[in-house]
Amino acid sequence: MMEPFVSIIVPVYKVPEQYLRKCIESTMTQTLKKIEILLVDDGSPDQCGEICDEYAEKDKRIRVLHKKNGGLSSARNYGCKAAQGKWIMFVDGDDWIEPDMCQTMYSAGEEKQVQLVMCGIMKDYGKSATEYKFYLEDGKVYKGQECKWLQQQLLVYNGNIAVAYSKLIDRKLLLDNQIFHDEVLRQGAEGLEFNLRLFEKLESAIFINKPFYHYIYNENSISASHNEVNHEFVIKCFEKIKAFIDTSDNKEMLKP
């Protein structure tokens, strides 16, 4: 297969079958065909790995990466390092994306020559769904110092941009600056910590105000669980975030 335009990275660990199948099928039916789909089986003890292998038999664009369990951050990094596309997109294994997400975001990224494309998010609770409120201008290209303002917005969750998903990221930006998820931060605010480092190096971005990404609220998921281990990881995340802010080139804007 020729080098794909977009590499979709899907971490998979103990995802209920109906969610996992919908997630994978939503990536397979993208209108942008020149993609690769990396299903990262993070040592899931159930049938997730076999389900991933099943889909790989049906679609040559799918690669299944089986690895020892290391957590969400580890799985994302594993996929990112194996990716071959010009652009990286993270999709969690229990979420799904609209058919035109890759095409629309890829076209915007190429046309505007930016390093990051962001889109809207729909939060699905099962019987109801709510579109996240974003306070970014639709179609606006952010450059230079405006990207520093975006970095500041991560800390106030303005527009819910402090997540790894719902983004198309220039792979070269990640690799050149060695921007990977901190694998010590297995859960909690790991997306915020990752994005702070990403936006530190960011020179251009665009926001598309369409909810292409469907976040499925699963009360049994790692991120939704409230236990001592989860709280411990959250504390570690914010300790890392404080340390980052103290040494950031943009620390005056980031401090309260």
Where are these regions (language model features)?
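C-terminal subregions of glycosyltransferases and related glycan-biosynthesis enzymes
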Residues: H214-P256
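Short alpha-helix within the catalytic core of nucleotide-sugar-dependent glycosyltransferases
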Residues: R21-E25, G49-D53, N77, G85, ...
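Donor-binding/catalytic cores of nucleotide-activated saccharide
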Residues: G93-I206, Y213-V229
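Cell-envelope/extracellular polymer assembly enzymes that use nucleotide-activated donors
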Residues: P4-S7, S26, E36, E193
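Short aromatic/hydrophobic "clamp" motif used to bind/position activated sugar donors
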Residues: I88
